[in-house]
Structure formats: C-alpha cells, structure tokens
Amino acid sequence: MNKKNTIFLNSLYMDFLTENELDLFLKSLDEIWTAELYTNLKQNGLIRHVISKVWNKGQHRITQVFEYESQDSFKKCESILKDAFTPKNCPALAKFVFKIFNNRGIVVSEYKSD
C-alpha cells in the first residue's frame, strides 16, 4: 500500500431508542450538518462524509463514515466536531438520546468498479 494514498476512516454507529427518534434525527440533518461546518471540515482535510440508515430488523441505527486526507486531518476535524457538537453550539443535536460506537482505521484494501 502506498502511504501517500492512505485514507484515514472513522466509521461511527448511532443507535437510537426508537424508529421515531431516528427519523426525527434524519429530518434534523441540515440543522446539525451545516454548510459552514462542512466548509470548515473540508478546509481541514475531510474528503467525504456518508450517513446511512441501517435497515436491519429491530435496529434503530444510522452509520456515518468519514474519510480524511491524513491522520493530522482526522485530528483537526475531530477537534472541530467536538466543539461543533456541544449542546451550546448545536442545540438540535442535544435533544436526541443515542449511543455512539466509533471505529477508526486506515484503508488496507479497496475495490472500485469502473
């Protein structure tokens, strides 16, 4: 693997108590993930952010995948997100109850179809 092409990832699961809470969270995405926040993250090395709703029966979960240019970019963006998502700075997020599971890593193998 070429270290120059290494992509740092953060895969995050968010489990909600009910489907209704999860759906309300999804309707609030524009309040939580603002254009200003994305601009700041992009300037600090965020390449991509994906939010997916998990449709496994009996789960009320979303996943988020963050791709970063480098480990340094990850650290900068982690600090930005920590500050952005305080109850004071993001009251829209503060109203939800959920559990977060984080998995951080680097891409070691990837397939892309042409």
Predicted regions located by residue number:
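Glycine-rich beta-strand-turn "strand-cap" elements at beta-sheet edges
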Residues: 1-6, 44-63, 86-114
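Short glycine-/aliphatic-rich beta-strand segments at the starts of folded cytosolic domains
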Residues: 7-18
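Short glycine-rich, basic-tinged beta-strand/loop micro-motifs
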Residues: 11, 59-61, 70
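Short, solvent-exposed aromatic-acidic interface loops
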Residues: 13-14, 53-56, 82
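Generic structural motif
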Residues: 17-19, 54, 69-71
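Short amphipathic alpha-helical segments
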Residues: 20-48, 85-89
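Short amphipathic alpha-helices within nucleic acid-binding modules
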Residues: 22-24, 69-82
